[in-house]
């Protein structure tokens, strides 16, 4: 995916470096290796395309564009109107009919599209919102950053089965904070 199309032209020469870059409104586009790691975790143990995926935190739209090649359908929700509009503009070039951009509070997910085979978040909070777990299909997987007891963030994988959920805490990461509401 052409990452330079998702950052400001002044930063285009840094688009392929393994670094996060500002995208406006105090938000960033994640490092390419972090995006790759999260998608790898989302797909681990699964073959073929993922079914319906919910992405929380559209940002500039880059990860939604990558997800469009891995999933049958992508619902991506952004709480900041300015970024929602920027993502819409960025994605227009690619004409991805399986990507649905939503403006709203990602902490409540998007119940109309549920259940999801996978949920991925680009912002981290103190806990995984219950709405996400409820909207995750049985057999589904959720990958998100979450604050640990030490106050740091770590990637968390949640697998949902008929018996319940299993949470695995992985490596340290640094994401923008997960916030409720819209702006």
Regions found by a protein language model. Give the residues of each.
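N-terminal auxiliary segments of SAM/dcSAM-dependent transferases
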Residues: 1-11
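Conserved nucleotide-cofactor-binding alpha/beta core module
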Residues: 39-166
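Short clusters of hydrophobic/aromatic residues that line enzyme substrate/ligand-binding pockets
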Residues: 6, 16, 21-23, 110, ...
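Short, solvent-exposed aromatic-acidic interface loops
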Residues: 169-179
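Conserved alpha-helix/loop element of class I SAM-dependent methyltransferases that forms part
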Residues: 10-20, 25-52
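Glycine-rich beta-alpha junction loops
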Residues: 1-2, 148-150, 173-174
């Amino acid at each position: 995916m052409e990452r330079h199309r998702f950052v400001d032209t002044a930063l285009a020469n840094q688009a392929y470096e393994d670094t996060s870059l500002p995208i406006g409104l105090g938000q960033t586009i994640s490092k390419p290796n972090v995006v790759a790691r999260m998608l790898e975790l989302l797909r681990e143990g699964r073959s073929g395309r993922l079914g319906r995926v919910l992405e929380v935190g559209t940002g500039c739209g880059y990860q939604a564009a990558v997800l469009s090649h891995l999933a049958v359908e992508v619902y991506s929700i952004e709480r900041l109107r300015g970024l929602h509009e920027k993502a819409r503009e960025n994605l227009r070039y690619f004409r991805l009919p399986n990507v649905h951009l939503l403006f709203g509070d990602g902490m409540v997910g998007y119940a109309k599209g549920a259940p999801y085979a996978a949920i991925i978040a680009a912002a981290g909070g103190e806990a995984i919102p219950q709405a996400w777990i409820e909207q995750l299909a049985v057999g589904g997987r959720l990958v998100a950053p979450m604050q640990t007891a030490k106050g740091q963030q770590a990637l968390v994988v949640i697998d949902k089965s008929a018996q319940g959920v299993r949470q695995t805490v992985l490596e340290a990461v640094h994401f923008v904070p997960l916030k409720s509401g819209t702006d």
